[in-house]
Amino acid sequence: MYAPPGNAVPANRRRRGGTALPKQPERSLASALPGALSITALCTALAEPAWLRVHGGTCPRQELGVADVLGYIDDKLIDEFCINSQSILLLRVIAAFCFLGILCSLTAFLLDVFGPKHPALKITRRYAFAHILTVLQCATVIGFCYWASELILSLQQQHKKYHGSLIYVTFAISFYLVAGAGGASILATAANLLRHYPTEEEEQALELLSEMEESSETYPADYDIANQFQPPPAYTP
């Protein structure tokens, strides 16, 4: 006996009427947002000329930064004892680490936004390797900034404007922007590391269910599996 075709419920309708399969996207907007803030802060720090503030020496400039040592260097900065060869080298190293930090942060941001499924890229994003590198770059920049400030302070103390001048060197806005970029990258790292991810077995099961769902959706909505088994024609001698 064959059941009438009209009594069977289409398989595709049964699937569509049920609950949707759980999706596990690799995107992470929670870490992409602080990653974007980190990129913005580092780019602004490079564009901002104020890294160190100088007071009390013979240098007429009140603010110094990496923009003063990239490309052409004004001879007055050296002649008026604002900077020397060592501080020039340190400021260039600071600029190089800022560029590396921007590159690492941009890589992490793209991984968080697009969420690639490639195994190597997936591991890189889940364990926040690019964000961690950004934090290290920012910490390195902060360390070199302190070193450069000590060198410039020593140079100003050797060339005081007046005998009793109070000389000090403080950090300017770019220094704090780099520190803020490092803090934002720490938040992005925490968002990636604290997020719950499915195990390998769960991922395989989800991929299998997704493939089954996609294959069922290739049939028309009114397709009935029972219709493909038509009863044989009546026997005629």
Swiss-Prot record:
Any one annotated GO CC term: membrane
Disordered, as annotated region: 1-23
Membrane topology summary: Multi-pass membrane protein
UniProt subcellular location: Cell membrane
InterPro entries on file: TMEM127, TMEM127_TM
A GO biological-process term: negative regulation of TOR signaling
Chain segments annotated as coiled-coil in the UniProt record: none
Family recorded in the similarity comment: Belongs to the TMEM127 family.
Name of the featured protein: Transmembrane protein 127
Phylogenetic placement of the source organism: Eukaryota, Metazoa, Chordata, Craniata, Vertebrata
